[in-house]
Amino acid sequence: MAVYTDVAAEELAEFLRGYDIGELLSYKGIAEGVENSNYLLHTSKGSFILTLYEKRVASEDLPYFLTLMSHLAERGIRCPQPEKNRGGAVFGTLMGRPAAIINFLEGVWPRRPNVAQCAAVGEGLARLHLAGQDFPLRRANPLSVGGWRALFEQSAAGADPLQHGLHALLHAELDYLEHAWPKQLPDGVIHADLFPDNAFFLGDTLSGIIDFPFACNDILAYDVAICLNAWCFEPDHSFNVTKARAFLGGYGRERPLTTSEEDALPLLARGAALRFLLTRLVDSLNVPAGALVRPKDPLEYARKLRFHQSVDSIRDYGVTASGVVA
């Protein structure tokens, strides 16, 4: 979450008159995150999240995200629900941006996830994948392997000034992944951005999964790889095999990986690392003046990419090919 677009009180009040969520008492921007503008609303009927969708979210994709959240919730996945306005629509326009209001979920996101939380998010991700199997809408992933070349071209000039040799690393890895990317793995609905700040906990219990604007249809194990990167490294960028074992074990208890998925996981983890390295690099070079946003460090994902380049098999992530402790 973040704030790129400042919302004037008068325009917000006019927008909220279209909803039955009570009288606005206060609102404030949420600085965490990097993609969309988010505000916490307090009204006479409770707390809500207002999201203005920014650069990487097209208004024509909003029915997919918002309908998906309702679909998942109906199947037991704890995720936000969009509020319909008085006309029955789940989104409108505010400050020239597509905007939606969702209900507020209780919980806090873990600043430093522990082993139990890694296991819980693995289970939660697998349940999300299973719950999405009968979702009728489809959306291609614009930030999968087919979209990385354009991101590289947008950011290439800024690579070596950030770190000597980064341009060569990106170029070589992109060439390799475009050639080697798997095409026959199980696919379906994925979250595609399940970082710790998009998972709420009450203690070690997963209380909610939020922030669905990158949800799409893609390789299920690619979503696993994204989480492996997001949840299983320490602040010093070292890989925590205990957390990885817990995460993969939690996932496998709900949806065991196929042999093909297990074999492909190191490659998918490289791809996931490259994806976030590229988007972070693009974002770091294009922060709007005055935006309430904290750009994420691209080099964090350069380190993760180099780690995954050294991985031979899923055993290096703490499990054997049969999904048990290595």
UniProtKB/Swiss-Prot annotation:
SUPFAM superfamilies: Protein kinase-like (PK-like)
Superkingdom, natural source: Bacteria
Keyword DNA-binding tagged: no
Organism expressing this protein natively: Rhodopseudomonas palustris (strain BisB18)
Classification via Gene3D superfamilies: 3.90.1200.10, Phosphorylase Kinase, domain 1
Catalytic reaction annotation: L-homoserine + ATP = O-phospho-L-homoserine + ADP + H(+)
The protein's name: Homoserine kinase
Family named by the database record: Belongs to the pseudomonas-type ThrB family.
